[in-house]
Amino acid sequence: MEHIIYQLEEDLAILTLNRPEVANGFHIPMCEEILEALTLAEENPAVHFILINANGKVFSVGGDLVEMKRAVDEDDIPSLTKIAELVNTISYKIKQIAKPVLMEVDGAVAGAAANMAVAADFCLATDKAKFIQAFVGVGLAPDAGGIHLLSRSIGVTRAAQLAMTGEALTAEKALEWGLVYRVSEAEKLEKTREQLLKKLRRASSNSYAAIKKLVWESQFKDWQGYATLELNLQKSLAQTEDFKEGVRAHSERRRPKFIGK
């Protein structure tokens, strides 16, 4: 794999985002590798737990804006739609996989990556972590199941406010709202993880598989209908002038001038 690192440590599969030169921005190849790694971990009977973390100063900015700029300039709507489909599938996979999925967040996590953190069963954050629904900044709406996941985690009103303002949610506030399991200093993050794994290793993997299925069936029965709506909206938004303006403005380091078209 070129864009992530996949390794095994006893019963733990570790997926590390490894594009720090672009702040671990998601593009099609990396998304496909994440799905491949998740499938490897899911199908390996020796793996009982999955950890997703990242190299670099930030966890991820979400979508790769350099790639978005290329797609906008070339009017490449299919690739933009493909990314939206892939990140949605990753969140869906995290929720469906019959093993506990942990995510370690240090620094900013934005866009689709922030929503994958919500999808994880346990999010461990450093005190420097910030969770950002950055989509409105480029004229989009949340993807990777964002509103579906957030509204069920923190309530409809808070989910809407985060999505509409794009405000950064601190690690402490995320902990208070229940989005984060534990917050620690960066140098203590690994210890926090090991404490959690020690606790999780006390129970049967069959229990975790059953619990995840029960949680899913009780709260996410309408996912497919939601995912279809989300993808169609994202495809439509990706064709707007405001989206093109948002991406170009970000690339040019200026404030976007949205016109509602």
Swiss-Prot record:
It is an enzyme of class 5 (isomerase). It comes from the Bacteria. Keywords: Fatty acid metabolism, Isomerase, Lipid metabolism. One of its GO terms (biological process) is fatty acid beta-oxidation. InterPro entries: ClpP/crotonase-like_dom_sf, Enoyl-CoA_hydra/iso, Enoyl-CoA_hydra_C, Enoyl-CoA_Hydratase/Isomerase. It catalyses: (2E)-decenoyl-[ACP] = (3Z)-decenoyl-[ACP]. Pathway: Lipid metabolism; fatty acid biosynthesis. Pfam families: ECH_1 (PF00378). One of its GO terms (molecular function) is trans-2-decenoyl-acyl-carrier-protein isomerase activity. Disulfide bonds: none annotated. Its EC number is 5.3.3.14. The keyword Transferase does not apply. Homotetramer. Belongs to the enoyl-CoA hydratase/isomerase family. Catalyzes the isomerization of trans-2-decenoyl-ACP to cis-3-decenoyl-ACP. Most active with 10-carbon enoyl-ACP. Can also use 12-carbon enoyl-ACP as substrate, but not 14- and 16-carbon enoyl-ACP. PANTHER family: ENOYL-COA HYDRATASE, POLYKETIDE BIOSYNTHESIS ENOYL-COA HYDRATASE PKSH-RELATED. This is Trans-2-decenoyl-[acyl-carrier-protein] isomerase. It comes from Streptococcus pneumoniae (strain ATCC BAA-255 / R6). The gene is fabM.
